[in-house]
Structures are given as C-alpha cells and as structure tokens.
Amino acid sequence: MPALVAPERRRRLLHRLSTVLLVAGVLVLADAGITLVWQEPLTGLQTRVRQHALRGDLKHLEAQGPTAIEAQVLAGLRSEQRRIAFLARSLQRRTEPGAAIGTLKIPRLDTSFVMVKGSDPSDLRKGPGTLDDTPLPGVGGTTAIAGHRTTYLAPFRHIDQLEPGDRITVEMPYATFTYRVQRTRIVAPDAVKVLRDVGYDRLVLSACHPLFSAAQRIVVVSRLTNVVPLRAARLGQGSEFGRTGLSSTAS
C-alpha cells in the first residue's frame, strides 16, 4: 500500500505544478496582450499616481506667480512676446529635473499629460519630458518633448496616427501655445538635425520606434500657429498678442 501512495502524491504534485504553470503562462500572455493593445499595466499605474501629484504641483506653480526679481524685470518689458520669452527662460532655469512644467494636450488622441522638465529615464516615468538642450515654448526655435509608447501610461503610444493639420496644445504657466502638425518622420536615434532651429517656432514630439524597440525614433513635427499670454505675461487689452494672437500658416 505505501508503494502506491508515493506515485499518487507525485501525480497530484505534477497536476498542481502544471496548473500553476498554465495560469502563469496565461498571465504572461495576458500581460503581453494588454501591453500590445493598450499599455503595460503596472508601470501605467505608477505613472497615473505620479501624474495626479504633478497636477497638484502644476497648480501650485501657476498660483505662485513671478518672484520679486522677475516682477521687477517684467515691469520694464512692454511687449508680451518679450515677457513670455523672459518667463520661459526663468522657468527653465529654476525648475528642477522631473518637476512639473506644463501640460501637453493632443485632441486627436484624446490625451492630456502634465509635462516634466528633462528626458532622463526617471523623468519620463512621470510623463512626457522636455529635452534639456531645446528651449521651452516662447523662447523661440524648436522645442522637443519625449515620451514612452508602451510603458508608463504610454503618452505617445499613438502619435503615429497624427496627421498634417492636427492640433497640439502646450499649456505653460505663462502662455498657451497651439501647434499644427506638419509631418511625421522616422529617424535614427542620433538624428539631432530634427531639433535644429529652422527660422520659426516648432514643436517636435519624439518616441522610440517601432513599438517595443529603440532601434529608431518617430518624430512628429509641428509649427506654432497661435500664442495666448497668461498671468504675468499679459499686458491687457490692446497688447501685441492679446489683440490677435501670434499666428502663422503651417506649411
């Protein structure tokens, strides 16, 4: 009788083990499927929590207003364009890496994310991040923002679906900037020429390409079409931007 017990125990153990392996396999496949169709769930939850905290930080930043020194400088700037540029440079200078700096909205994709300063891995785990070597909107030139496509809420998951003419809005504490998509390109990771100054203000969104690979980069290039000054940047009615906004025709 004892000789029969051991094989029976082994069969039960093997059955349990096979069940565990089957469940584990299903979970792995489910996670892969979710990542492929939507986004990786665990890192997404982390970023969702961080985004909630960043929204509070951004509201606090907007409510702070300019420092005493900034207010003195602003008093001598009678052009909203110059005031915006000054506030943009000041914000970039005094903001710590990974801190909230503005909001990126892409209506076609129905997305709205708080942006952070910087594009290091730790920064991009919180949301889209500005590239340090590019100016903030309002300074002039090409502003670049990087983001993930498959993890950490995948803010740029569907940027390949953007079409020429689509609107992208960047809300900064000092102004709201509207861009219109010009084109989408696939480039090498070291193709820094896409960030060069081309003589007018642009926004470049950048992410790894293809999905689940860092072999290339997908970049969406947009042109600035309108600026609405906010808070300390405003001069009131009759101002340079306040009357008509800053507009141009996207090419």
Over which residues does each language-model region extend?
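N-terminal Lys/Arg-rich, disordered targeting/topogenic segments
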Residues: 1-11
